[in-house]
Amino acid sequence: MALSRRRFLQATGSLSVLGAMGAAASVPYSQGEDCPRLVPPSGSVDCHMHLYDSRVPAAPGATLLPPDASLDDYRQLQRRLGLRRMVIVTPSTYGTDNRVMLEGLARSGTDARGIAVVASTVSDEELARLHGAGVRGIRFNLSTGGQALDGIELLAARVNELGWHVQLATGPLLADIAPRLAALPGKVVIDHMGHVPQPEGVLSPAFKALDGLMQQGRTWVKLSGPYLRSKTGAPHFEDVGLVARRLISHYPQRLLWGSDWPHPTQSLQNKPDDAALLDTLLDWAPDDQVRQLILRDNPVDLYGFA
């Protein structure tokens, strides 16, 4: 199949970046070459990653248009981190077109679950088809030009009957929408630690809203994307670490970890070191049993891994 001009430019740009990272760098869209110091428990899950394929057109108005990032690319990261299971999240790039995510599920068997984006008019038959493919939740993305919360209450009720949850990338809106989320039936998953702003951190209205949702007992939080809000930066993200530690100390049984690979909000020259991201858990959650909850037990329960 001939390369389109867009795909050719993406490929050559990616090769240039990989060359800048060093000839031995083997994982696309990830800095560094070392394996993490943290050895994940067997059966651990990367609860947040995306796949991109430019053969599937982007949705009108999409603001994130990353280069292709394939399942084979991601499997290189899995080998580096010592992981096998993952949750494939349809990104805002494709709107309600879940084909790239579904292809990833079909190729991954029981090692993967999916999070779909659906229209408020989605049919029961389509939801059943998605469930059979391995989808276990729907996502609303308010941070990068994704869809608004129109119809979230009705959709939440419908997917709750399937045992699914509602996942949200809230951007800066968490404090404003928390009352609506608190009233939803079923489980809610918040991406990227609620995008709690820094340097306000645990004193911010966003964190207070997040803490209130967690106190209800039906909300899960992904310890992912620390670079999105950190002012102190890599590798330790000390400011975001204060938010993570507070959550871990109070709600260890409803936390998840995700890589956010291929880090679509970050430029090709500024991708994080995924091994270092995983190693933040050594500082944030020094107890082995707590890390086992975050990396394996919690996601196995939430996503229904066997």
Regions found by a protein language model. Give the residues of each.
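Mid-to-C-terminal alpha-helical segments outside catalytic/metal-binding sites
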Residues: 2-22, 27-43, 68, 72-85, ...
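Short beta-strand segments
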Residues: 88-89, 117, 222, 258, ...
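Conserved, mostly hydrophobic/aromatic
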Residues: 48, 101, 159, 221, ...
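Active-site phosphate/pyrophosphate- and oxyanion-stabilizing loops and adjacent acidic/basic residues
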Residues: 75, 102-103, 178, 211, ...
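Mid-domain alpha/beta scaffold segments of enzyme catalytic cores
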Residues: 27-162, 172, 238, 276
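Catalytic pocket-lining loop regions of alpha/beta-barrel enzymes
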Residues: 149-257
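Short, small-residue-enriched loops and turns at beta-alpha junctions
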Residues: 93-94, 120-121, 144-148, 196-199, ...
